[in-house]
């Protein structure tokens, strides 16, 4: 069995399914009687995210070497960060998703699928080469960063569509994504100063975890409540709402 493929599936797809269960179980059956979203729609849009993430990863395989070019790396990081988030907006910014609280969850599903595909491809792609244990751990860390950031920024873009302010929140997600890619530039550099790669990965991991925590556990419950009230509705079973 291809070890790289197995690890890519475990980290990319396996972690995505675990995250999906951990986050969404408080908003659907059997935890509550009236789910906050449609399960079939969520899985469809998760599949769309997998497709988009695959296309973006193909683009990544052409762009990553440019990260090492002085000056050009910053431009590529900014452009790639923007492309990822606007891809989510193009998918979510439909009339059927505008102004409804469900969209926040669909944004999560879309971003999670996109991040899972990126993580899967990244691990499989990098592990085709001969990497030592330390390098393998670094690649896995990078892949998990994409998974967390994808899901979190999906919620941010979804919030914008739900609040009928898509561009405002998408630009916020773009800033997060661009900051993440800029921080990670040293990871791609060919240098003997290996500690700079560690610092970049740790800083990017901290940023991804912070954005994920803020989006999922701080923002999501409040946004659901706000959008429901915007539509003249209210619920007292929103998980995490104080």
Question: Where on the chain are the PLM-derived regions?
Answer:
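Hydrophobic alpha-helical segments at protein termini of multi-pass membrane proteins
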Residues: 1-242
